């Protein structure tokens, strides 16, 4: 099977929850190791029968987790429950978790920015450290705890289980094997710049978003260069859109376009890129030919309005993901909410209460605190990072 087909298959699996042999990527999320938390309290709910999926516990007091709501997967149940600690459910701790992705093994992987680690969260809500050492910042390749990162922000997974990480504080792109071995793929640690060319000669500046297309190309939101970069399968780096150092907002082709601190990027099956243009509070689209247009929001207008794309408003949206139907979900960080952009371009709020920066778990609307990472699971559910937690979200249909 070709690498292109494998890449396409991974994206299909991530967005549809199909099975191949014994591999099930249909993952919904377990709450607190057998319990469900409401608000910041914890309700111990023991059950003695199997569920269709270990990430789908029942709600205490009736109903099921397939009902719209917000569920805890792992992390502390209070605003000050930080730190970095392996453990199960609410016993685990995260320190500024940001990017999140569903791997081909059915586990979630999280870039833990403040601790400088990559964490793995099982379908049972057990969090372990895959690579890096909490609190030990630096840039070292190596296996597991011997590796060092400096503010890893987002990550992507391929069909083989390799992770691609934007090591933002080092201005590099790192690769993590399924076993936790870390190598530097592109850029040079501590050298913020903008240079195309071979991976070793290329330079980035605080890159944050990263995505993988069906042809095996990586695309990077090079945040402080205000550009979109591509790393092809030969590890050659090129600039796709924007101009290094030119913060602004302009639609157009390639170098005629302008971004301002783009923080995340996602690609659909047709090769269109979607960018969370955070400082502009807009969502942008980049066509395969490099044509950039604004999909939703208005540059420089931070707000909460739902509605048609041009009428909608976001506030420092920092992350996005796309499902198999082409629906975009946006982690609207400054508003503390998850927004949906349908095929018509209409924007709606599907999780959280815009303007309320607080985590309240349970039935919708609930609320979130500065969600910074989001990924698609199966059957219409999402996983997100918010505050110091990893959450499962079931938007209203």
Predicted regions and their residues:
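Bacterial Sec-dependent N-terminal signal peptides
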Residues: 2-5, 10, 22, 26-69
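Gly/Pro-rich loop segments of beta-rich domains
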Residues: 62-98, 126-153, 181-208, 236-263, ...
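Residue-level detector of Asp-centered blade-edge/turn motifs that repeat once per structural unit
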Residues: 102-105, 157-160, 212-215, 267-270, ...
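Conserved beta-propeller blade signature
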Residues: 107-109, 162-164, 217-219, 272-274, ...
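Short loop/turn segments immediately following the C-termini of beta-strands
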Residues: 113, 168, 223, 278, ...
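A short loop-to-beta-strand structural motif that recurs across blades of beta-propeller domains
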Residues: 116-120, 126, 171-175, 181, ...
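A generic tandem-repeat structural signature
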Residues: 151-156, 167
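Blade-level signature of beta-propeller repeat domains, shared across WD40, Kelch, NHL, RCC1
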Residues: 370-397
